[in-house]
UniProtKB/Swiss-Prot annotation:
GO biological process, one term: regulation of pH
Cross-referenced Pfam families: Na_H_antiport_1
Protein name: Na(+)/H(+) antiporter NhaA
Record-stated family: Belongs to the NhaA Na(+)/H(+) (TC 2.A.33) antiporter family.
Subcellular location: Cell membrane
Chain's gene name: nhaA
Organism: Renibacterium salmoninarum (strain ATCC 33209 / DSM 20767 / JCM 11484 / NBRC 15589 / NCIMB 2235)
Recorded catalytic activity of this chain's protein: Na(+)(in) + 2 H(+)(out) = Na(+)(out) + 2 H(+)(in)
Parts of the chain that traverse the membrane: 31-51, 74-94, 112-132, 143-163, 173-193, 196-216, 222-242, 285-305, 315-335, 350-370, 384-404
Amino acid sequence: MITSRTARRTFRRNSYPEHLRITAILRKETVGGALLLAATIAALIWANSPGSESYFALRDAKIGFNPFGLKLDLSLGAWASDGLLAIFFFIAGLELKREFIAGDLRRFDRAIVPIAAAIGGVAVPAIIYTLINLSSGAEILNGWAIPTATDIAFALAVLAVISTHLPTALRTFLLTLAVVDDLIAISIIAVFYPHNLQPQYLALALIPLGLFTWAVQKRIRSWYLLLPLAIITWVLVHESGVHATVAGVLLAFAVPVVRRDRNPDNGPGLAEHFEHRFRPLSAGVAVPIFAFFSAGVAIGGWAGFTNSLTDTVAIGIIAALILGKAIGIFGATFLITKTTRASLDDGLSWIDVLGLAILAGIGFTVSLLISELAFGADSPHNDHAKVAILTASLVAALLATVILRIRNQHYRKLEKLESVDADGDGVPDVFDEKDD
């Protein structure tokens, strides 16, 4: 008797503990996304009101000092992008390391699809932007990376607003894709957008980073030691000319994920402890404040809005975020699924993947950061890029809403199925099923 091997499935459910962890993360990010949306709206209203001068005066107000010749006299807007976003990337780094060491990304068969989707979602938008601006000059081409990012908090806020009951597997895919996307984004920032590179400061940063690594590997949790080391690392990376948010990722990668016995099944390590402490600070404070100072752009009414959208920078960003993200993510997912002879998990359709791919076109936080790095905070191209990012994110959200709402009744059935515990063991029955 010949037994056929069970077909590989894309978007399979996680284990139940992983399902609970992902659900908790998404809940916090959804709240953060709502605050992010509120901060963005407040910034746009203030920046286009009769009192707009006070907004820009606040954003550009300098605070800090310059000890030992260090350049720490920064504007509030710069503190938000260089300092607060380092917390955001610290959380992204913790999540990425956990996924690769103790999560789904440690298994090639589960990792290949979200990684390929993230790469496709970065490469295709970058290509589209570059093709549109091929003859526009080097300055404009420098913005090629702006449409490569996905804002998970904003995307989850959209899901909350439209009240979709998206299956856990799809939400997990979106989160994992965004985590990989963040790694690619920070790599792009570090490699392609340094400013007056000073290698000696990078070398000096290795000292506090090494001490921080030693301390966390010893499972030391004392903030009297860890926080000063983290701040010194941040300062030295900032002085090096590499964007200071890179320090957040480097510090995160130093933190151990699993316990000393290195068995992922024995529970979380120090990384999850830090994540629990800092995720609310990142999602609820750091990112909304950054959005408040970064999203405020004086549009200049309808005439100013249409003028912004005639800039090839804006055209490239809008096309790349709306079309490029959808084509790149959907295309890569479809290609990997078909070439590995896998199939979508039961109850899912390719229209679900398309909806998620379009939703990933919401590229807000990191896109705004890269725009400032590419063009400079005071450049007209940066203002046009902000308008384009906001416009493209809104259009992507509306298109995704249409597609996902069509499937919402079906999602309700899947969500109900994921809550049935007929055997009363405390674990919904669908999570008891094994998928080899």
